[in-house]
């Protein structure tokens, strides 16, 4: 693959035709979501279809339940959600998708992990490689940056006057969360990936809503780029996130790249 490496995590046969590690401001995250809503519909539909391979009833499929709730949070139409489920359960004809991850560096040595879900690995590999090359980065070998991250469930909740810090802490910890970090804008709940769906459900049932929630690569080592590198990093993230094959982009950048 001309020096570009990726590792395959799982393949899916779909019947039918997604870092939050650095949140930035709540306003910045909301603005990013709004500007990419159409692309998010496509990405979330893929995620729902993949999750539905393990069963089309969200009551008994925690992964599907979470995927549906995330789609509803961005106002994805119910028809789109239903169609995506049917593609996963085999009620509609389908295509094959494969889940890939790429590791590499952006401008200034910022570490990137890019999660993909694609029906054409050559197309996606070429796109990711060229995107990094054009914006001052490079794709590396598996493991070249993943050692700087830990995989965790992350649930971001906006701080409001109606939310009591003790209540949310109690609800999260009782559901199995590992840690809760708060600041003037938000609460961030961290979980082991294995209990993420349970914590997500418990907090949803308790009436909390999420700005974002997912299983993330959370950086344990930060990278602070120069001012000259920040525009290149932001452009690279924009280019990657605008592509339907890219489900999630994780970085260890200490600077908010969504402002």
What are these regions (language model features)?
Residues 16-131, 136-140, 145-154, 224:
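N-terminal cationic and glycine-rich segments that engage phosphates or anionic surfaces
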Residues 1-19:
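Short, Lys/Arg-enriched N-terminal segments with co-localized hydrophobic residues
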Residues 154-259:
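Positively charged, low-complexity, intrinsically disordered RNA-binding extensions
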Residues 9-11, 48, 200:
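Generic alpha-helical secondary structure signal
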Residues 2-3, 31, 50, 170:
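Residue-level detector of intrinsically disordered, flexible termini
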Residues 1, 14, 40, 64, ...:
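Generic detector of leucine side chains in alpha-helical contexts
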């Amino acid at each position: 693959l001309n020096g570009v490496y990726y590792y395959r995590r799982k393949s899916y046969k779909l019947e039918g035709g997604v870092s939050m590690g650095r949140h930035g401001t709540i306003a910045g995250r909301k603005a990013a979501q709004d500007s990419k809503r159409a692309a998010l519909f496509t990405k979330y539909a893929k995620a729902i279809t993949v999750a539905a391979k393990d069963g089309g009833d969200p009551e008994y499929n925690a992964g599907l339940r979470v995927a549906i709730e995330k789609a509803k949070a961005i106002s994805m139409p119910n028809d789109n959600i239903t169609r995506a489920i049917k593609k996963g359960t085999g009620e509609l004809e389908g295509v094959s998708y494969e889940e890939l991850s790429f590791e590499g560096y952006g401008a200034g040595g910022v570490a990137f992990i890019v999660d993909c879900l694609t029906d054409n690995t050559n197309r996606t590999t070429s796109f990711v490689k060229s995107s990094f090359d054009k914006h001052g980065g490079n794709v590396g070998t598996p493991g070249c940056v993943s050692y700087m991250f830990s995989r965790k469930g992350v649930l971001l909740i906006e701080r409001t006057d109606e939310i009591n810090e003790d209540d949310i802490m109690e609800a999260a910890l009782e559901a199995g969360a590992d840690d809760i970090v708060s600041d003037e804008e938000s609460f961030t709940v961290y979980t082991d990936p294995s209990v993420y769906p349970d914590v997500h459900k418990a907090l949803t049932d308790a009436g909390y809503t999420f700005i974002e929630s997912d299983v993330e690569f959370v950086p344990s080592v930060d990278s602070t780029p120069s001012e000259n590198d920040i525009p290149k990093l932001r452009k690279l993230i924009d280019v990657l996130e605008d592509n339907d094959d890219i489900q999630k982009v994780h970085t260890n950048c200490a600077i908010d790249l969504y402002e």
